Amino acid sequence: MWGLGARLAGALGVVRVGDGGREAVVGGRTVTADSPRDLRGRLTNALYEEFHAGRGQGGFGADGPPPRRTLRDPALERRLAAAVPHATTPVRGRLVEVLPRPGGDELVVRLPEATVRVRADRLSAPAVPPAPGAYVELALEAARPALSPGFFYVMGSRPLPRPAGPVRRLFVHARDADAAVLLWGAALGALEAAGASYHAKVLSDPQDFPRRDSVVVYLHGDHRPGERAVVAALVPHAGTATAPDTSVFTEELAPGIAAAWDPEDPRPGQDGMSFGQHRAFALASGLIAHALADGEPGDRDAHVVRAFLEAGIDPRHPQHNLTTRPGDRR
């Protein structure tokens, strides 16, 4: 028989949905909407902030600095870039064309995500450009500062498996930007030493700290060596660089360090959401369904369980999907 995990069930004590699914209270924050459909989106955001990111109502008080006009901070990005232990990442693609140029040939290569034009010296295998249509391996920049808004993104020095298969996420709760630089460098160094296949991102806006997902690591293939290495590298900083709490939707590995599996929602049109957004959306759906059913307070968990099952989430362990294999839980 399905039920909600104790941690999530306990957290729901700060949530109330009423007024026919048009008003909700999450912690000390009230959100309203003209319809249950509109409320679901706003409630999803509030649950994401309260239960996953840990920002509560978020933002600065009246005496705090004004909102930034950009999510990028050049000084912080330079520090984050300096902490990356490798310069390039291998990417495999199909050669489309060789373009002779006076200053050196260029290659047009069709990668999984896009078709790019690069200098021929980016070719790492084979040694010389083959005929168009052949597969080649390029050495591209590992650091990609503007790829994910508000985050500094990096690819590991080892190729990712294709197809990707299940992806394990690690979340690190950095207290501030200085702590994030320290934790970022330590995590990447541990991942490289462990031979992990991964990519990762870290908050690049100093005003957005602290967050429970300040650093996010995406582990491919056998996640366990990389996961153990990151935990071992970061545990010595518990209580100083890391804040203790973690997302309600995740599995806590150590204070301020948590893990979960990428969503595997069986319904069409549900891809594209982050882990935290996916879990918060499912939770909001169940809470609003309960409000519309005029059910008893004790029925609320049953509605949330139903919404989680429809979204492919294990309601007892929301860090897992229903498709998570037993061996993946280790």
In which residue ranges do the predicted regions lie?
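Polybasic, proline/glycine-rich intrinsically disordered low-complexity segments
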Residues: 220-330
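Charge-rich, low-complexity segments
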Residues: 1-171, 291-330
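Enzymatic toxin/effector payload domains
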Residues: 174, 215, 254
